[in-house]
Amino acid sequence: MTTQSIILLAVFLLVLLVLAYPLGTYLAKVGGTAPIRGLGWLARFEQFLYRMAGSNAQTEMSWKGYAIALLVFNVLGTFFVYAVQRMQAWLPLNPQAFGNVSPDSSFNTAVSFVANTNWQGYGGESTMSYLTQMLALSGQNFFSAATGIAVIYALIRGFSHRSVKSIGNFWVDLTRSTLYVLLPLSVIVAVVLMSQGVIQNFSSYKDVALIDPITYQQPKVGTDGQPVVDDKGAPVLETLTAKTQTIAMGPVASQEAIKMLGTNGGGFFNANSAHPYENPTAFSNLVEMLAIFLIPAALCFTFGRMVGDMRQGWAILGAMTLLFVVLTAVVMGAEQQAHPGLAALGVDQGASLMQAGGNMEGKETRFGISASTLFAAVTTAASCGAVNAMHDSFTPLGGMIPTVLMQLGEVVFGGVGTGLYGMLVFAILAVFIAGLMIGRTPEYLGKKIQAYEMKMASLVILVTPCLVLLGTAIAVVLDPGKAGILNPGAHGFSEVLYAFTSAANNNGSAFAGLSANTPFYNVMLAIAMWFGRFAVIVPVLAIAGSLAAKKRLEVNAGTMPTHGPLFIALLVGTVLLVGVLNYVPALALGPVVEHLQLFK
C-alpha cells in the first residue's frame, strides 16, 4: 500500500463514521411508529398514502404475514419491470426509438432490479429508454432498498420485543423507509453529483464529428438490441468505420444517487461509474463510495438504539470494519505490485511522481489505483456492484478479494438492510458455537438461541454457496455455458465463478470478459438472484418471529458479553471460517491458479 492509499482509506472511514452516527439515530426513529419532530407534513402525506392504498397502518403482522406481503409486492414489481421493457418501443420518453427488450433479457433485468442485484447483461445507453430507466429500473432501486430496510427493522424488533407474535407492518416499514430516508437522501446526493458534472436532462443523444475516422469490429446487434450469435453461440462480429461519435444523454444524476444509496449498482451507462457522466471527479467518486456505505453503517447504530444497548451496534460495526480494512489492504497492495511478466522485461512499474505504478489496466487515470481499488472493495463488500474500474482487468489476487468479499455473504457492511441481518445471523451462529464450548444454552441480547433459530440460520448461510457452486458447475459443463467463456483456462473459470457469486449474493458486478447476455446465462443468473434474495429473507423473518415470541432474559453472571473484543474476534472468525471455507476449492481452481501462472 502507498501512503496515498492509507490516507484515502482513513479519511473515507472517518467521514463515514461522522455521517453514519446521526443517520443511525434518525433511522431508529423511522423504524418506530411515532411522528418525527419537524416532519409532521410528511407524516400527513404518509397517512394519505395509507388511506389511498386501503392499508391499516396500525395492524401488526406475524412473520408469515410479513413474508407473504413482501413476496407479493416483489413478485408484482417483477412483472411490472418485465412488462415495461417488453413494451418499451410503444411507450413515451424514448428519443432514440429503442426497440422492445428480448424476453430473456427482460426477465433477467426484472429479477435483477427487484432483487437489489442490478446485474446488467445489456448496455444501458444502447438498450433502455429514459422511461424504462426512470420508471421501472429507478423505481425498483427505491423499492428493493426499502425492502431490505424493512427486513432489518423486523429482525431488530424480534430482539427488542417481548412475548409478542408480531414483528411490525411491512407496508408501513416500506413506506417510511422510502419517504423518510431514501427519497430525501437521494435528492441531496443527486444535487451534489450534478454540481460535479453528472448530467440530468431529457435531450436526444448528440452526434459529434471525429478528427479522424476509426475502423473497428464489434458484436453485431439485432433489432431487439441484443447481440447476434452463430450456431455455436459465439457473437457475430461486424466491421464498422466511424466518422462521428454518439454521446449519450439522459436523467443520470437522479438514478445515480439511489443507485449508490440503495446499494443497487445498476449504471445508466454500460461503463457504470467509470463513465465521466456518472462519476466525473475525484470528489464525486468519494461521495459515491460514502453513499454506498452510509445506510449499512448507520443501521448498526440503529440496531444499538432499538435494542437499548449502543455497545451492540458498535460491536457489529467493529467486526465489519475489521474485515473491510484487512481485505481492502490486500486488494490495494495486490494492484500496486509490479506484474511479474512486465518486470521480467525491465518495465518500470514503481509508483513515482510521474506514474501511478502497479496495474493501471482497466482503471481510469482520473482515479488511479488507490481510488479504484477502494471503490472495488466498497462496492463488493456492500452488495452494490457499481464499478469505477474493470474488475476483470485486476490482477488474480486483486480480483480474488472482491470475489471473497461477496462470498462472505455480503455481511461486511453489505447491502441496505441485508448486510446487517446477514451479520446478525452470523452473530447468532457465533453465540451458539460459544454456548456449545462452555456448556450453556446460548443467548443473544437476552433471547435464547434454540434449535429452530439454528435451522433457519443454517438455511440463510447455506443457500448462497449452493447457488454459487451449483450454478458455476452447470455453466462450465454445459455447452451454452462454455460458449460464453471468451478467456480460456483459470481466468475463464474465475469469470463464471464471479458471475454466479455476484448474482447469488445480490451484488451485480461482473468480470466483463464473460458473454452473459444469452438465454442460458440470463435464466441461470436470474434463478440465482431470486433465490439468493428471497430464500434468505424468509428464514430471517422466521427467526425474527421466533425471537419476538420469547421472553427477554435478564443479564446474569453466566451471560456471555456480546459487545467486547472477544465477541468481535469470535464473530469475525465465524464469518471467515463458515463463509470462505465453502469456496476454497473453487478459488483454488480460479484466481489462485491464475496467480501462480504469472510466475511461469
UniProtKB/Swiss-Prot annotation:
<dbReference type="GO" id="GO:0008556">
    <property type="term" value="F:P-type potassium transmembrane transporter activity"/>
</dbReference>
<comment type="subunit">
    <text>The system is composed of three essential subunits: KdpA, KdpB and KdpC.</text>
</comment>
<keyword id="KW-0633">Potassium transport</keyword>
<feature type="transmembrane region" description="Helical">
    <location>
        <begin position="458"/>
        <end position="478"/>
    </location>
</feature>
<feature type="transmembrane region" description="Helical">
    <location>
        <begin position="65"/>
        <end position="85"/>
    </location>
</feature>
<protein>
    <recommendedName>
        <fullName>Potassium-transporting ATPase potassium-binding subunit</fullName>
    </recommendedName>
</protein>
<feature type="transmembrane region" description="Helical">
    <location>
        <begin position="136"/>
        <end position="156"/>
    </location>
</feature>
<dbReference type="Pfam" id="PF03814">
    <property type="entry name" value="KdpA"/>
</dbReference>
<comment type="function">
    <text>Part of the high-affinity ATP-driven potassium transport (or Kdp) system, which catalyzes the hydrolysis of ATP coupled with the electrogenic transport of potassium into the cytoplasm. This subunit binds the periplasmic potassium ions and delivers the ions to the membrane domain of KdpB through an intramembrane tunnel.</text>
</comment>
<keyword id="KW-0997">Cell inner membrane</keyword>
<feature type="transmembrane region" description="Helical">
    <location>
        <begin position="179"/>
        <end position="199"/>
    </location>
</feature>
<keyword id="KW-0406">Ion transport</keyword>
<feature type="transmembrane region" description="Helical">
    <location>
        <begin position="419"/>
        <end position="439"/>
    </location>
</feature>
<dbReference type="InterPro" id="IPR004623">
    <property type="entry name" value="KdpA"/>
</dbReference>
<keyword id="KW-0813">Transport</keyword>
<dbReference type="GO" id="GO:0030955">
    <property type="term" value="F:potassium ion binding"/>
</dbReference>
<keyword id="KW-0812">Transmembrane</keyword>
<feature type="transmembrane region" description="Helical">
    <location>
        <begin position="314"/>
        <end position="334"/>
    </location>
</feature>
<feature type="transmembrane region" description="Helical">
    <location>
        <begin position="523"/>
        <end position="543"/>
    </location>
</feature>
<feature type="transmembrane region" description="Helical">
    <location>
        <begin position="6"/>
        <end position="26"/>
    </location>
</feature>
<keyword id="KW-1133">Transmembrane helix</keyword>
<feature type="transmembrane region" description="Helical">
    <location>
        <begin position="566"/>
        <end position="586"/>
    </location>
</feature>
<keyword id="KW-0630">Potassium</keyword>
<dbReference type="GO" id="GO:0005886">
    <property type="term" value="C:plasma membrane"/>
</dbReference>
<feature type="transmembrane region" description="Helical">
    <location>
        <begin position="367"/>
        <end position="387"/>
    </location>
</feature>
<feature type="transmembrane region" description="Helical">
    <location>
        <begin position="283"/>
        <end position="303"/>
    </location>
</feature>
<comment type="similarity">
    <text>Belongs to the KdpA family.</text>
</comment>
<keyword id="KW-1003">Cell membrane</keyword>
<keyword id="KW-0472">Membrane</keyword>
